[in-house]
């Protein structure tokens, strides 16, 4: 009798475990293609999207491509072959996906570009992101405010770093920052001693911290043996950490030679700790929980045959079409407000930042 009861229990458990995936499959499957695990923010993004989609009853397929373009193409092709209903894609190179997205479009699969615009494709349905131009504005404003340029102080030496040239967002970040910095450069209140300006000269392929650190090393040895750096525009926290390491390597970070004002983005833990320690000056917080929520709302609408909510239908032209977008607001974070924004807001626990 005991064995029969055990068998019945096992069958019941088996039926229950089968029922959950069957329910999720009935609601639809969503493929999520993320670029890399080398940045903490993409891990958080992936986890947030999966959590919210599964809570909404969807089956998910989350893949990370290790910043390898052929790998990401293969992953997306597999998702299309498996018959996902929606693709959520944070591309490595937004110009390389046209062919695979054409396959997706032919099968009626909707495509949501996640935080990185996918270019040269008419099969991108929607775009969920932050106001990327404003990100750059906030980065540059944190620098100009700290230097006191509005109060007439200066001149100061600044060097510029851009993001990856294959990431459309990098140009928005840079253009936003330069909308603030260029008037001061033109007036001589900010001096780029290297003369290196423009994304073709200051871009950092794949957002690689080691590349940024090596470039900062070169700038210091070539242009600053008899001068000091007062500020560095950095578009991403990972680059900021590499830049600061380079600066500390030649003596910055002491009472006699303080670190320059260094910006950042993504509020990654090492950079928030650096801000608290008085090294990196600022970062830009982009709440990936909210971005995931917007994305899930888009998925829900698409699955129900409705038009998702968007708030921008003019800005993001991808070479083929203007992609309907939902833009979230970024927030500048410094030592003065990190606790209010990041800890009180529930994004981090205080002990994570110690």
From Swiss-Prot:
It is found in: Periplasm. Residues 1-25 form the signal peptide. The lineage of its organism: Bacteria, Pseudomonadati, Pseudomonadota, Alphaproteobacteria, Hyphomicrobiales. SUPFAM superfamilies: Periplasmic binding protein-like I. Its main location: periplasm. Induction: By L-arabinose, D-galactose, D-fucose in the presence of GbpR (galactose-binding protein regulator). CDD domains: PBP1_ChvE. GO terms for biological process: chemotaxis. Pfam families: Peripla_BP_4 (PF13407). Belongs to the bacterial solute-binding protein 2 family. Required for effective transcriptional induction of the vir genes by monosaccharides in response to plant signals and for normal growth and chemotaxis towards certain sugars. Functions as a periplasmic multiple sugar-binding receptor protein. It does not interact with a transport system. Coiled coil: none annotated. The keyword 4Fe-4S does not apply. This is Multiple sugar-binding periplasmic receptor ChvE. GO terms for molecular function: carbohydrate binding. One of its GO terms (cellular component) is outer membrane-bounded periplasmic space.
């Amino acid at each position: 009798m005991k064995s029969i009861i055990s068998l019945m229990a096992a069958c019941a458990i088996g039926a229950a475990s089968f029922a959950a995936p069957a329910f999720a499959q009935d609601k639809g499957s969503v493929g999520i293609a993320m670029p890399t695990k080398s940045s903490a923010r993409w891990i958080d993004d992936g986890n947030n999207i999966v959590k919210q989609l599964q809570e909404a009853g969807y089956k998910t397929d989350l893949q990370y491509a290790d910043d390898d373009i052929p790998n990401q193409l293969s992953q997306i092709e597999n998702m299309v072959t498996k018959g996902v209903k929606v693709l959520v894609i944070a591309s490595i190179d937004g110009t390389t996906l046209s062919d695979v997205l054409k396959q997706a479009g032919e099968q009626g699969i909707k495509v949501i570009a996640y935080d990185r615009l996918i270019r040269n494709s008419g099969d991108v349905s929607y775009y969920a992101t932050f106001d990327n131009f404003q990100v750059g504005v906030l980065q540059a404003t944190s620098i100009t405010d700290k230097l006191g340029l509005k109060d007439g102080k200066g001149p100061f030496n600044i060097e510029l770093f851009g993001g990856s040239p294959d990431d459309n967002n990098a140009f928005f970040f840079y253009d936003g920052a330069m909308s603030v910095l260029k008037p001061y450069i033109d007036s001589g209140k900010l001096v780029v001693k290297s003369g290196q300006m423009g994304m073709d000269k200051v871009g950092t392929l794949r957002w690689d911290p080691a590349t940024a650190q090596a470039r900062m090393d070169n700038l210091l040895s070539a242009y600053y043996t008899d001068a000091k750096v007062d500020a560095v525009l950095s578009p991403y926290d990972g680059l900021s950490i590499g830049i600061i390491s380079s600066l500390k390597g030649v003596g910055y970070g002491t009472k006699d030679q303080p670190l320059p004002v260094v910006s950042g983005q993504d509020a990654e833990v090492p950079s928030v700790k650096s801000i608290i320690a008085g090294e990196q000056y600022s970062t830009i917080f982009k709440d990936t929980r909210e971005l995931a929520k917007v994305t899930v709302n888009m998925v829900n609408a698409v699955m129900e045959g409705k038009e998702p909510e968007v708030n921008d239908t003019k800005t993001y032209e991808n070479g083929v079409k203007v992609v309907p977008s939902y833009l979230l607001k970024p927030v500048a974070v410094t030592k003065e407000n990190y606790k209010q924004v990041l800890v009180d807001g529930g994004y981090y626990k205080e002990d994570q930042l110690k």
